[in-house]
């Protein structure tokens, strides 16, 4: 809804705040990014910004509500889809001499990349360049171009096999946000999720 920068402006090296109200996925529906001349200036400023969030339709989503919805959908014969359409599972289970029934659950897990999500972006001669460790640059180019409102040939991703991923680095959020902030700032930027932010946005 609004961002109060008054305390952040007292921090040496603070540049400003980039506000993205649209987001780019159903879950990530908006961001506020603190810009600083150094990482520590930006990190301190991020904590000093007072943001009045519009929490939207996901405001009550939690690990428990996700689990509850999963169980509800599993019990609904009309939800989901079938991978295998052969045989009669119900008949087979009914007539089986030996059966093993169990429920295995685990908590939602953090990917735990070796280094938090980060990227460098800058625009040169009308082309946005993004440098980072990423696992799916084809995906990242298309999504970043769409977020910037340009054709895919106006985005170049430079891939580094670094940082660990475990699947987390297939997501385009860090690329999109870094490119948007670079466009907003009109200068090269390095966007770094703190470890806490990395866990929050995983």
Task: State the predicted function of each range.
Residues 1-202:
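Structural alpha/beta core scaffold segments of enzyme domains
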């Amino acid at each position: 809804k609004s961002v109060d920068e008054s305390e952040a402006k007292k921090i040496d090296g603070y540049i400003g705040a980039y506000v993205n109200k649209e987001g780019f996925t159903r879950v990530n529906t908006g961001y506020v990014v603190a810009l600083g001349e150094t990482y520590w200036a930006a990190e301190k400023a991020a904590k000093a910004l007072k943001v009045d969030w519009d929490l939207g339709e996901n405001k009550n989503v939690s690990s428990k509500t996700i689990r509850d919805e999963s169980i509800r959908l599993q019990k609904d014969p009309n939800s989901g889809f079938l991978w295998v359409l052969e045989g009669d599972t119900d008949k087979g289970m009914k007539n089986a001499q030996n059966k093993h029934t169990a429920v295995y659950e685990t908590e939602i897990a953090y990917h735990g990349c070796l280094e938090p999500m980060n990227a460098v972006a800058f625009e040169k001669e009308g082309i946005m360049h993004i440098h980072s460790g990423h696992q799916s640059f084809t995906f990242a180019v298309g999504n970043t171009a769409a977020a910037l409102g340009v054709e895919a040939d106006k985005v170049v991703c430079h891939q580094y096999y670094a940082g660990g991923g475990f699947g987390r680095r297939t997501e385009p959020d860090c690329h999109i946000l870094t490119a948007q902030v670079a466009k907003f700032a009109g200068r090269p930027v390095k966007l770094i999720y703190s470890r806490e932010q990395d866990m929050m946005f995983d």
